[in-house]
Amino acid sequence: MIDAFFIAGTDTDVGKTVASKAVLQALAAKGLNTIGYKPVAAGSEKTEQGWRNSDALHLQKAATLEVAYEDVNPYALELPASPHIAAKHEQVEIEYDLLSEKLAQHKEQADVVLVEGAGGWRVPVSDTDSLSTWVQQEQLPVVLVVGIKLGCLSHALLTAEIIKADGLNLVGWIANRVNPGTEHYADIIEMLESRIDAPKLGEIPYIPSAKRKELGKYINVEPLLNID
């Protein structure tokens, strides 16, 4: 069984956090201790406790183990922009060593660590580097979240290709219906199933305020548990 994996998205706003919550809930239903980890988050709000990102808070709440917010989300950036822009605005350098240190800490505590990315696969974290470089460094298996909408086929297939070209193991994908009006839904799913060389872990229907709902029933985590 893998002890950590990375949740990637075909783009921003495709439902990575919704899918992450669903996976965490499904893992918890199997009796596993989990931690949700959001290394970098842009679009945070100032609170009495410090800067907080809503997606990271959802991960913190969905996990079975209690972890300090600063360990769930070491880089909570204010601007709702690409991480490299938000980091530059705050004069912050995103250090891979810190991300790795937190990941190692989480692995010691949990059976499974779910690491949620930011934006799409090649989202920059500096003028010269992307978060995917750190994922390669850690050799994290990847689960791809596909937001089902017009144009998602090309985005999904290209992202799946580049993940594998980066030398990483694509261990599954999740369909998240972000637009209830998307036509030809079944045809889109059929094409993704035939073209993505990884198991479909589930389909999450369009659900208003999905981040606040019980979603684990939509996910089959068995393929993840059977990976050495």
From Swiss-Prot:
Binding site for ATP: 13-18, 55, 116-119, 176-177, 205-207
Pathway assigned to this chain's UniProt record: Cofactor biosynthesis; biotin biosynthesis; biotin from 7,8-diaminononanoate: step 1/2
Disulfide bonds: none
One protein family per Pfam: AAA_26
Cofactors that this protein relies on: Mg(2+)
SUPFAM superfamilies the UniProt entry points to: P-loop containing nucleoside triphosphate hydrolases (SSF52540)
Catalytic residues (UniProt): K38
GO biological process: biotin biosynthetic process
Record-listed E.C. numbers: 6.3.3.3
Residues noted as binding Mg(2+) in the record, renumbered to the chain: T17, D55, E116
Main subcellular localisation: cytoplasm
Swiss-Prot/TrEMBL catalytic activity: (7R,8S)-7,8-diammoniononanoate + CO2 + ATP = (4R,5S)-dethiobiotin + ADP + phosphate + 3 H(+)
Function as written in the Swiss-Prot or TrEMBL entry: Catalyzes a mechanistically unusual reaction, the ATP-dependent insertion of CO2 between the N7 and N8 nitrogen atoms of 7,8-diaminopelargonic acid (DAPA, also called 7,8-diammoniononanoate) to form a ureido ring.
Family that this chain belongs to: Belongs to the dethiobiotin synthetase family.
Protein's recorded name: ATP-dependent dethiobiotin synthetase BioD
